[in-house]
UniProtKB/Swiss-Prot annotation:
One of its GO terms (biological process) is translation. HAMAP family: Ribosomal_uL30_B (MF_01371_B). The keyword Ribonucleoprotein applies. Keywords: Ribonucleoprotein, Ribosomal protein. PROSITE patterns: RIBOSOMAL_L30. GO terms for molecular function: structural constituent of ribosome. This is Large ribosomal subunit protein uL30.
Length: 75
């Protein structure tokens, strides 16, 4: 399962209480704090609700084999 790196970029001051609660539920406490969550529909829905306050990056799946050039030349 892939992971999502979520960074809290903009303050929730002036936004509705449920958006502030969503930020807290994601585990974000201070501006520029970063959390990593599994990529699930629940987390995606929370991110969608506060997409104007956070930035999101997909992290590569660590379980998948890495495709490195030159691996076929190793003995």
């Amino acid at each position: 399962m892939s992971k999502l790196k979520i960074t809290y970029r903009k303050s929730a001051i002036g936004y509705s209480h449920d958006q502030k609660a969503t930020i807290r539920s994601l585990g974000l406490r201070r501006l520029n704090s970063v959390v990593v969550h599994d990529d699930t529909p629940t987390i995606r829905g929370m991110i969608f609700k506060v997409r104007h306050l956070v930035s999101v990056e997909e992290l590569p799946d660590r379980d998948a084999p890495a495709d490195h050039p030159g691996d076929d030349m190793k003995r």
